Structure formats: C-alpha cells, structure tokens
Amino acid sequence: MTTKSLGSFNSVISKNKIHFISLGCSRNLVDSEVMLGILLKAGYESTNEIEDADYLILNTCAFLKSARDEAKDYLDHLIDVKKENAKIIVTGCMTSNHKDELKPWMSHIHYLLGSGDVENILSAIESRESGEKISAKSYIEMGEVPRQLSTPKHYAYLKVAEGCRKRCAFCIIPSIKGKLRSKPLDQILKEFRILVNKSVKEIILIAQDLGDYGKDLSTDRSSQLESLLHELLKEPGDYWLRMLYLYPDEVSDGIIDLMQSNPKLLPYVDIPLQHINDRILKQMRRTTSREQILGFLEKLRAKVPQVYIRSSVIVGFPGETQEEFQELADFIGEGWIDNLGIFLYSQEANTPAAELPDQIPEKVKESRLKILSQIQKRNVDKHNQKLIGEKIEAVIDNYHPETNLLLTARFYGQAPEVDPCIIVNEAKLVSHFGERCFIEITGTAGYDLVGRVVKKSQNQALLKTSKA
C-alpha cells in the first residue's frame, strides 16, 4: 500500500487549510490529486501539518483487510492530533464497500464520499451538516476536472479508465468501482499534452484494467490500448511512457512490437498473473490458463529481450493444495518475473471466493508466502549480481528516505513506489531531481541496487540496453 500526504501549495485563504492523506494505489492518488485541484481552485490552502488543518481528507483503500486496518489507524491518529473543530472527511473505496466498519468513528467524521464522488469534495467540506454521498459513478464521466500533481515533478500518473469488466472470484473492486468507463481519446491527449508541457518526463498509464481500455467506447475487437499508444507516441517531447495493470491476454503483438521499436515506450509491463495452476486459475475466474501464460511470457521475452516484468500472485486461495502451491513455487523459481508482489489470500465478503470450501489457515498462508519470498529473493540476488559493473541509464528521483546523504534513482525496469530502486552514494554530477544519468552499479542492498553516477545522459532519452 502507498501512504502519501499531499504537499503544500500556495493559496490566498489562510484560515481554510486542508490536509490530504492518500492510501492505497496510484489510482487512488490520482483521485486525491483531483480533489486537491478542486479545492485549490476554490481558494483553499494545502498544509503538510495535520495540526494546522481545518479540513482533513482521508482517501481510503479497501482492497484487503490490512488496507482497511491502516485507514482505521489513520482515523485514530487524525482524531488524536487534529485541532479543535477541524473536520474529517473520509472518501475512497472503504466508504463505498465497508462503511459499516467506520461506525465506531462516525461521531468524529463530518462527511463520507464514495470513491466515485470525488467531484463533490467542495460541497462535502462546506456542508454545515454531517452527511454522505456514495455512488459507483466516476468523475471521468464529467470530462475535464482540475488536478494538482503531488508526485515529483518528473513523473505523473495518467488514469485512462475507471471500473472493471472482469469478475475475479477474490476481488471486490468491480463492486466498488462499477462498470468500465474509458476516457475519450481527445480527453486523454489533452491531459497528456498538459503533462508533457509541464516537463513531466515519465507518464504512467493506469486503470483498474489498462488492457480493457476503450472496449466500452468501440465495437472494434482490435486492441484499443494499442491504438491509444500509437496516438500518444505521436506526440512530440522528451518523455517515457510506462504501462501498469494489464492482463497477459491483453498485450497484443502490436503492443509488444511498440515496446521493442519505440524508445519512448518503456519495455516494462505490470501483469498480475495471480497463479499458474490451471484449477486454481479457473476457481479464481481468471481469463488465462497456464499454457497461455507461459506462451505469452516466452513470446514477450523472445521479442523484447530487455523487458522487465512485474507481477503479483496470491497464496492460500481456498482449496490450494500443497502440490498446487508447489507448482506456483516452481514457476516463480524459473525466474520469469523480475519484480513480484506476493499477497496472502484475503476472504472478502460478497465475493464468490469467500463462499468456497477449504479456506486455508493463516499459518499455512504465511508459510507459503515466506517460501515464495525466499525463492524470489534468490532470483533477484542472482540477477542483481549480474548488473554489478554495468553502467545503467536512470532517472534521479529524490533523497533517500533515511538520509539526505544518499539519493534514489530508477532505471526503466523500476516503476515508482512499487519496485526496488538504485541507491546512489556518489552523485557529484547530479544537478536536479528528474535528471537522467548513467549509474555504475557497484553493489546491492536487499532488493535494491547500489551505484555511483558516472556521467549525465547526453540527449536525456532512454537507451534500451540488453538485460544482463
């Protein structure tokens, strides 16, 4: 999960200060940025300090129990720290699908907003009475909305769709976000150009299911995402384009060809596979089989040897036998996945999987997670050792979270916030964050690489070197 306090921005009103906390995924962060943009446009002022805020907006995640527990912890903290008469507004997925879990805090909450109702943030904080507005619609249907970026200046997320057509047995997202609603091409192009004109160097396309983009706008069975990529890549400018959240059967041959041929489209995909055993995949109501997954991975790595693949898997799905888990462990051990997120199955109410027999004990799930983590760590160690001595082009992100004596950087195989990074311990040549430099890899630290800047990039454009 990602926890992000949105930064301070200039405004003209000093007594109407707002403080945002955005929990969960990058899609939630974009929603928070839209709400922040609406309030700044109305004349409110953002503050980094909870104690200074007149309005505290908590944008929640509800995908897993752990995410809901995090939101409750933040509510307790806000209640303890906020100044007298400051109002708390809770929005996001938790209000849409788990409002009952907020009952113990309702006397402290001024307003509830559904995850699709962010355009009502102004009326929520200005309401004299406590209340709520919760629906499954989306501000995407409104067209253009204000937005205040909160990410570092050199990268930003671009949400191209809301909702999901899939019905995975373990997932509550469709019930929260509703049906698929894609932004029209002209709206996306307008937002894209705004980002490029702001000198954003890395634009990350996101949706609940990016590969389904446009399928609600057209009866054409060809990939609408591929068409969108072609249009975006026609745009002039110095930028990288990254894709997150795709199903393996949605990555067309044309998209693969673009990754290989166009230096602006990063050879990186985030594909949540969830499992590899056919019976489990069927029980999960996934759309691909083991054979299809392996065929896709083989084709992708053959056509784009330098590609980096991120994925996620679930351990302890109801009925998962030791043999079926071992099949997953063997698959992970083969090293197909570069960056892996491993999740314990969470029994979510009102999902088909919650009603399945043979729910797996927590201790067994935790043991299986530990085994997969150890396997993936060996894969990462083996790969990272091959990179020692290599000079890799990377973007300088920020200071290291633990000390300003170190910097963090990322090369094309590392997405912000979810993947490991490069820890830079020698950076005399760096003049600003967002700059692209060549970094010599000198060592490793856990999942991260360690290196020193040896020279600046000449044309500030990505050079796609082969993977080690």
Curated annotation (Swiss-Prot):
What InterPro entries does this protein map onto?
Elp3/MiaA/NifB-like_rSAM, Methylthiotransferase, Methylthiotransferase_CS, Methylthiotransferase_N, Methylthiotransferase_N_sf, NA-bd_OB-fold, Ribosomal_uS12_MeSTrfase_RimO, rSAM
Location in the cell reads: Cytoplasm
Q: Is this entry keyworded 4Fe-4S?
A: yes
Per the record, what are the reactions this protein catalyses? L-aspartate(89)-[ribosomal protein uS12]-hydrogen + (sulfur carrier)-SH + AH2 + 2 S-adenosyl-L-methionine = 3-methylsulfanyl-L-aspartate(89)-[ribosomal protein uS12]-hydrogen + (sulfur carrier)-H + 5'-deoxyadenosine + L-methionine + A + S-adenosyl-L-homocysteine + 2 H(+)
Q: Which GO terms describe its molecular function?
A: 4 iron, 4 sulfur cluster binding; aspartic acid methylthiotransferase activity; metal ion binding; protein methylthiotransferase activity
Q: What residue stretches are annotated with the Radical SAM core domain?
A: 150-382
Bound cofactor: record note: Binds 2 [4Fe-4S] clusters. One cluster is coordinated with 3 cysteines and an exchangeable S-adenosyl-L-methionine.
Ranges of residues in domain TRAM: 385-455
Might you name a Gene Ontology BP term for this protein?
Answer: tRNA modification
The positions annotated for binding [4Fe-4S] cluster 1 are: C25, C61, C93
GO CC, any one term? cytosol
Q: Which residues form the MTTase N-terminal domain?
A: 16-130
Give the protein's cofactors. Answer: [4Fe-4S] cluster
User: Which residues does the annotation say bind [4Fe-4S] cluster 2?
Assistant: C164, C168, C171
Q: Does the keyword Iron apply?
A: yes
Where does the chain cross the membrane?
A: none
Q: Which domain of life is it from?
A: Bacteria
- The primary site where this protein sits is cytoplasm
Q: What keywords were assigned to this record? A: 4Fe-4S, Cytoplasm, Iron, Iron-sulfur, Metal-binding, S-adenosyl-L-methionine, Transferase
Role description: Catalyzes the methylthiolation of an aspartic acid residue of ribosomal protein uS12.
Q: Family, per the entry?
A: Belongs to the methylthiotransferase family. RimO subfamily.
Official protein name in the record: Ribosomal protein uS12 methylthiotransferase RimO
Give the organism, scientific name: Chlamydia pneumoniae (Chlamydophila pneumoniae)
